[in-house]
Each structure stands twice: as C-alpha cells, then as structure tokens.
C-alpha cells in the first residue's frame, strides 16, 4: 500500500478534546453545560448502537445527554409533541432524532419541526439553505466531518476536481456544497450517471457515499488522488467494508480513509461540535 491512511479515529479524538475544552471553558464562566436530546423510536439494533455511541461521546465531552427512548408504536403526533417540548426546553441546545424511524412514521415533518437553531444534524431546510448561500451555521455532520479530514492533510482545494459519488440529502448533496465553498471544481455522480469510471478517474478528491460495497474499483482511481470512503457496508461474514475497493485503491491514491475508522468517528465528533456551537453562538443568552 502506497497511500497514507487518514486516521479518522485520531482526528475525531482531537476534535472531541477541543469540544471538551470548550465545555469546560463554559463551566469556568459559570455557564451551563450544552445539552443534546437524543430521541430513539423502537428497537432497531443498529440504531441502538449508534445512539449509544452518541450518548457516550456526549458524556465524555461533558455535554448533558438527555435520552428519550420511545416504543416502536409511538404515533406521529406523540413524536411531534416531544419535538415541540424539546424545542422550548432551554437546557436543550441540540435535538437529534435517530433515523431510520419505524415505517409508520414520516421523518420529513419531524425533521422540519426541529427548530433550526437546535438542528445539530444539519438536516433542516433552513440550515441546508444557509449552506447553499455560503453562510453555513449548523452543517450536516458527515460532510463537515469529511472537510475536517481533508483539512487535516492540507488539501489544496482550489484548482482540484472533487467528484462525489452519491447524491443523498444526508451526504452527497451537502458534500458538494462544502467542497464548492472550499473552491474545488465539483462533480456529483448518481444512479443516472453514465461512465462512472471516467469521472472517478478524473477526481483529485474522491468522496464515495453510495452504500454499495466495492462499487468504486481501485484501478479507476487517479494516481495521487485523495479517497474518502463514506460507505459502511456489513458483509455476510460480519465484517465492515466501504464503497471503494480499498486494497487496489490504496496502491494508486496518495491518501485514503479506512472503513471502519475513517469517516464514521468524524460524524459523531462533528455532532458534538455543532452542539457546542449552538450553545455558544445560537443560544448565548440562555
């Protein structure tokens, strides 16, 4: 392997230490700890693991973690009422509703109901609009975390061709806006893109966010490229792998993120950053 690994665990640990220092600085000034309300509906095993990790990270950083574990049969009205209650709670700086929700619930009205200044996931149309207008406040966690990874290796964005594979609302679309803000020339590939290999081969910065193991062949990667693999796919043998053929891509890339241990830890670290930002900037008077 010739590529240098971008160690998301180490970089995320640094971010979390910075957040913990920021929380401690608030306390030294006599201010309350930031508060994050995490709402889990049902008993999806993967969601329970994700939520547990987020709550643990909050506690380690000194952020107040407020847990709301609701039964599988929770109604739309009951969930919306809880969001309304959390919106008005001055101890809550951030509200996170863990997705996916059970099939009988509609996530869109829930996410829109979260107050934009408490939308620490960065999914609210207001916050996406701010990002589009080049005035971001609370940024979507995974794309913002990717930028932190790229910054850590001194990525020269201007003049670089960034190719994002995947056009989801959570990663692909806001990722394109983040890279545009940095000055990169940005291309988004999706399921209707012809000749994916061509675009991948032109990428100085490649971000793969599809959710299909090995969809990006290693031999497609441009020599010297930076490869960010957002995909997390569990194989039949229980192992995790990304969207990129890691071993082959690592022979051509200059930098590459592993799966696991690359982008995943940054998502939670950025969630903590957003929660502290909401407390310090958006709720400075509470």
Curated annotation (Swiss-Prot):
**What is the protein name for this chain?**
Bifunctional protein FolD
Q: Which residues are the signal sequence here? A: none
Family statement = Belongs to the tetrahydrofolate dehydrogenase/cyclohydrolase family.
Pathway noted in the entry = One-carbon metabolism; tetrahydrofolate interconversion
* Positions contributing to NADP(+) binding: 166-168, 232
Which InterPro entries does UniProt cross-reference here?
A: Aminoacid_DH-like_N_sf (IPR046346), NAD(P)-bd_dom_sf (IPR036291), THF_DH/CycHdrlase (IPR000672), THF_DH/CycHdrlase_cat_dom (IPR020630), THF_DH/CycHdrlase_CS (IPR020867), THF_DH/CycHdrlase_NAD-bd_dom (IPR020631)
What GO cellular component term, any one, is given?
cytosol
* Annotated EC: 1.5.1.5, 3.5.4.9
Protein function: Catalyzes the oxidation of 5,10-methylenetetrahydrofolate to 5,10-methenyltetrahydrofolate and then the hydrolysis of 5,10-methenyltetrahydrofolate to 10-formyltetrahydrofolate.
Q: NCBIfam families in the record, alphabetically?
A: PRK10792.1, PRK14186.1
Swiss-Prot/TrEMBL keywords: Amino-acid biosynthesis, Histidine biosynthesis, Hydrolase, Methionine biosynthesis, Multifunctional enzyme, NADP, One-carbon metabolism, Oxidoreductase, Purine biosynthesis
One BP annotation, GO: methionine biosynthetic process
Q: Does the keyword Transferase apply?
A: no
Q: Which GO terms describe its molecular function?
A: methenyltetrahydrofolate cyclohydrolase activity; methylenetetrahydrofolate dehydrogenase (NADP+) activity
Catalytic reactions on record: (6R)-5,10-methylene-5,6,7,8-tetrahydrofolate + NADP(+) = (6R)-5,10-methenyltetrahydrofolate + NADPH; (6R)-5,10-methenyltetrahydrofolate + H2O = (6R)-10-formyltetrahydrofolate + H(+)
Subunit composition and interactions: Homodimer.
